[in-house]
Structure formats: C-alpha cells, structure tokens
C-alpha cells in the first residue's frame, strides 16, 4: 500500500495520477474533505481507501497496524501563505508532520514530503537548500522551514529514505478548489471566460517566479521513491519567468485579450516574493535528469485541460 496525505489536493491528486500510471491503485488517501468540492480531483482516478486526516493521525499515535506500506507521500498541509493563525499552522504543518515522520522512521517506510520555496523568504538570489539562505516572510513559510530543520536533525540517523521538496510556484490541473491560493494561470483563465482582460499587479513586469508544472512535480516525487532518494531538494524548473509570460500564454490560447494592470494590494507589501528561481544543482547531483515544461508549454497544456 502507498499512503498519500492531501490526496484530494492539487499535488497529492497528481501524485495519485502518476501512481495509477505505473499501475499502483493500492493507495490510501488521507485528507480533510470538509471542502467536499475537492472530490472531483480523484473522480477519474483509482484509490483503495480514504481516511480523514485526524482519524489517521490518531491511528498512527495509537500504534494501529496499517499492514505493509511501500511509501508515504505527505502532501497534506495548510498551504495558505496568507494564514496567520500560528497555532493552526504549527499543528497542521509541523506537529502532524513530525508524528508521521517518526511513524515512517520507526517502520522504515520511505517518507516524501512537501516543503516550500516560501522557506527562502524575500531573497533575490541563492535559492540553495541550506539554512543560511532561509528566512521566511510569513507564518506558513516558517512552519515549513521549521519542519525542514527538524528533518535535518534526524536525517543522519535515518534507516529509510526521508526526502523533502521545496516546491516553487506550482500550477496546473486539479487546483480549482484552492480559491485565492490557486495559480495565476487559473485566475487569468477565469477572467478571460468572463469576457474580461487578464489582470496583473502594477510592477508585475519585474516580478519573476519559478513556475513549475504540477505533472513535473509528481514525476520527481515518483522518481525519488523509485530511487530511494534522501535529503531536501528544490523543485522548480531552475528558470524564473514573468507573470507577463503566464498572461501572454493565456491570451495566446484564447486568441484574444490584452493585459490590464491593477494596483498592488497593501496587505502583500513586504510579504511578497518578487523573485524565485530554484537552484537545481543538488537535485541534478542526486541523479534527476528529467526536463521541466516552460511557462509557454505548461500553460498551453493547462489551458487545454481547463477548457476541455
């Protein structure tokens, strides 16, 4: 059996899809389905079982027997960078992750988890997987950073793979449930469908992000499992591109429209990453040779999926 937490979420459901594609359907999905609309992310995929996230961690703590587990992909978390309830974040993103990590270590189960480029904060260079380059700007980023630090403490003694991925700006299919946290491509497409022009913040021509297609993210996770990879790695394309490039790809797909600029919101000032670019040196050194879709390639594929 394979366990995927956050399996109804964007990255989790794409990992389920990637597992199905290699013939694995013996998957236990763990999630919080309070937002029932997320069910659509797995409706075309095959899993063996579902468990509520709180029931699951209670079973872990109680020492219940789950049978033979080949891997745990821990994608479940509060992913809202605008969330400032620190107690909630630390419970969901830190304490929960620690319990699951120790369960995997105790049973020698390969453990793969979602970290985030938010751990780097507002820096404009050196996105390298080392403590000296990490200074998160928000509570979400801090919760992810703290778990990375915890993993660094236990890694030297681990007898089974423990692997974290600092996801950069992930976009693509199965994110419609995320609301304001969905990718800019998703929101721009919705604006176009309403007959509006795609809207970007003023100054966005200078905002560069490492936009990585979600199917590429899932591929790296599967590769890490199949190759027993341990460590903490950046997961982006290694090339920053502009929000303008995303908007242009959406316009090109629809064959109409032009970019409109809107004021930059006050609540994001000083808490906004204006540049991100994954340094892939460590991932490549670990042996990953796969390519990553460009914004033009990934957005075109995503638009076709959204507007199918």
From Swiss-Prot:
Top-rank taxon: Bacteria
GO annotation terms (biological process): ADP-L-glycero-beta-D-manno-heptose biosynthetic process; carbohydrate metabolic process
Transmembrane segments: none
InterPro entries to which the protein is assigned, alphabetical: Epimerase_deHydtase (IPR001509), Heptose_epim (IPR011912), NAD(P)-bd_dom_sf (IPR036291)
Binding site for substrate: 169, 180, 187, 201-204, 209, 272
Class of the enzyme per the UniProt entry, highest EC level: isomerase
Keywords for this protein: Carbohydrate metabolism, Isomerase, NADP
Cofactors: NADP(+)
Residues forming the catalytic site: 140 (proton acceptor), 178 (proton acceptor)
Functional pathway: Nucleotide-sugar biosynthesis; ADP-L-glycero-beta-D-manno-heptose biosynthesis; ADP-L-glycero-beta-D-manno-heptose from D-glycero-beta-D-manno-heptose 7-phosphate: step 4/4
Sequence positions that bind NADP(+): 10-11, 31-32, 38, 53, 75-79, 92, 144, 170, 178
Example GO molecular function: ADP-glyceromanno-heptose 6-epimerase activity
Note accompanying the cofactor annotation: Binds 1 NADP(+) per subunit.
Keyword Isomerase set for record: yes
UniProt catalytic activity: ADP-D-glycero-beta-D-manno-heptose = ADP-L-glycero-beta-D-manno-heptose
Enzyme Commission code: 5.1.3.20
Domain comment quoted from the record: Contains a large N-terminal NADP-binding domain, and a smaller C-terminal substrate-binding domain.
Quaternary structure and interacting proteins, as annotated: Homopentamer.
The family this protein is said to belong to: Belongs to the NAD(P)-dependent epimerase/dehydratase family. HldD subfamily.
Its biological purpose: Catalyzes the interconversion between ADP-D-glycero-beta-D-manno-heptose and ADP-L-glycero-beta-D-manno-heptose via an epimerization at carbon 6 of the heptose.
HAMAP family: Heptose_epimerase
The protein's name: ADP-L-glycero-D-manno-heptose-6-epimerase
Species, as recorded: Actinobacillus pleuropneumoniae serotype 7 (strain AP76)
Gene that encodes the chain: hldD
């Amino acid at each position: 059996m394979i366990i995927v937490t956050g399996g109804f979420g964007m990255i989790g459901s794409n990992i389920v899809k990637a597992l199905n594609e290699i013939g694995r359907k013996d998957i236990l999905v763990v999630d919080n389905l309070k937002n029932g609309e997320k069910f659509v992310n797995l409706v075309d995929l095959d899993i063996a079982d579902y468990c509520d996230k709180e029931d699951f961690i209670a079973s872990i703590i109680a020492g219940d027997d789950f049978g033979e587990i080949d891997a745990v992909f821990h994608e479940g978390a509060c992913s809202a960078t605008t969330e400032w309830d620190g107690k909630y974040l630390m419970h969901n993103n830190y304490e929960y992750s620690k319990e699951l990590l120790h369960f995997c270590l105790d049973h020698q189960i390969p453990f793969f988890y979602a970290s985030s480029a938010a751990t780097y904060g507002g820096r404009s260079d050196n996105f390298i997987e080392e403590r000296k380059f990490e200074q998160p700007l928000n509570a979400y980023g801090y919760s992810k950073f703290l778990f990375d630090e915890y993993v660094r403490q236990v890694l030297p003694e681990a007898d089974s793979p423990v692997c974290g991925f600092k996801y950069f700006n992930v976009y693509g299919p199965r994110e419609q449930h995320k609301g304001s946290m969905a990718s800019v491509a998703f929101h721009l497409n919705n604006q176009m469908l309403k007959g509006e022009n795609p809207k970007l913040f003023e100054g966005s021509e200078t905002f560069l992000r490492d936009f990585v297609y979600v199917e590429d993210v899932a591929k790296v996770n599967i590769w890490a499992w199949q190759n027993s990879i341990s460590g903490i790695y950046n997961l982006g394309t290694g090339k920053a591109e502009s929000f303008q490039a995303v908007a242009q790809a959406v316009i090109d797909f629809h064959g109409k429209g032009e970019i409109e600029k809107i004021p930059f919101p006050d609540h994001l000032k000083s808490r906004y990453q204006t540049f991100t670019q994954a340094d892939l040196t460590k991932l490549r050194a670990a042996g990953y040779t796969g390519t990553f879709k460009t914004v033009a390639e990934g957005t075109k594929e995503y638009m076709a999926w959204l507007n199918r």
